[in-house]
């Protein structure tokens, strides 16, 4: 059997392989969001959407059995989960096909199992199939739900989603940038014509010019100087040291 599966993997396309992986019988793990997102993007290609539809159709037809096995329960449940995801994120072409084949979903409203331990899974399948049918039969609700999902995906800038219109995000980014620039201008300190270095230089030069100091005034007794009365002292500058460069 593993050899047969290996042979089948060579003849099936990568798209078919992805859909089969998302709807396999492994109940320990479901399809990841990344895998379902890749499949939803592939629905926008005319070629790959046909391959996706082909695999999903075969999976849904498993529910026609009156006594479904445990394996069928797992595969049908995973297929309905993928269908629900593609209804919100897939192309209009996929939605159109789904509306034209609602009989495949309607059959699952009466899904039956052969093992009583699978009764809970059967109830989940019946409930999910009714939810899918409710959306398919209400165009307004389906359209609103798809728009809400697209808007949410746009808000988180999902890479690779070409069908997403994120023009409102670009406008918001532009507004944020203008606001940031405005705040930076307000917070920027005013510039002066004299820099701090220049002020320091001026202060340093002032100290250089003041290397010498004036000596205190000293009194000298006059010695019969003409024009000066005796006993009257006169003032003179007396340097403190001989190191004064101006002496």
Swiss-Prot record:
Cross-referenced PROSITE patterns: ENTH
Molecular function (Gene Ontology), one example? clathrin binding
Q: Which Pfam families match?
A: ENTH
| Domain (ENTH) ranges | 7-146
- Residues annotated with Phosphoserine modification: 195
GO BP: actin cortical patch assembly; actin filament organization; endocytosis; protein localization to plasma membrane
Q: Where is the signal peptide?
A: none
**Renumbered residue ranges of the record's region Disordered:** 179-247
Kindly state which keywords UniProt assigns to this record, in alphabetical order: Phosphoprotein
For this record, an example GO cellular component is: endosome
The record, for CDD domains, names: ENTH_Ent4
The note filed under miscellaneous reads: Present with 1960 molecules/cell in log phase SD medium.
The protein's name is Epsin-4
UniProt organism field: Saccharomyces cerevisiae (strain ATCC 204508 / S288c)
| Gene transcribed to yield this protein | ENT4
